[in-house]
């Protein structure tokens, strides 16, 4: 993709936090390549309305083919910002879940994210500049009872981002981890969690989460927890026994808990 403006690549951009991150980029002087596993026609219209050029790719970033499809769409263009936001969740007990569905969560949240960062991160290091924003989660701070695999993937991402940031500290490439809490997106519907307390209660505005994450990326911060309540939860998680955190998570994510509050 040829562009005279800085180029941002945003994954998971069809809706929610990803869409709002793309709009932040468009409003702040970036042209975009966006990717999701479904149509992004509305996202394209909103991005263009902000004066940015955009190329949209439908790809499953939990597969090697999907990552290659996105890299191919970028071509030889210089990437100034990579916002690796694509991710999936799945509710209910681990042993009751379909294993292939679990595998796809790992492939999307970890393997595909790493593959894309590995490809684009190398070119950023070679060019001596770039910004990487990875969407982690405060879920990575606690054992995810009834979301065991999802929380595990986010624990990986939260840790990985700091390690990569340190490896790149003298290269001109910054790495930032955005750690939201429950946000008003399609996540809980797609994860089959609408019958849970966390799935049915009031959530954060994705536009505000994206604004906070974009600013942290542009400021070169290491991480940012979006929202005061989430900051308190994150701080408490660091001093609370894992057994207690697991029980607290059960009360939020166990099927049927939406009817108990």
Where are the language model's segments positioned?
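C-terminal helical subdomain
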Residues: 177, 197-234
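Rossmann-fold cofactor-recognition segment
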Residues: 49-64
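Conserved glycine-rich cofactor-binding loop
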Residues: 14-15
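Active-site helix of classical SDR
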Residues: 117, 153
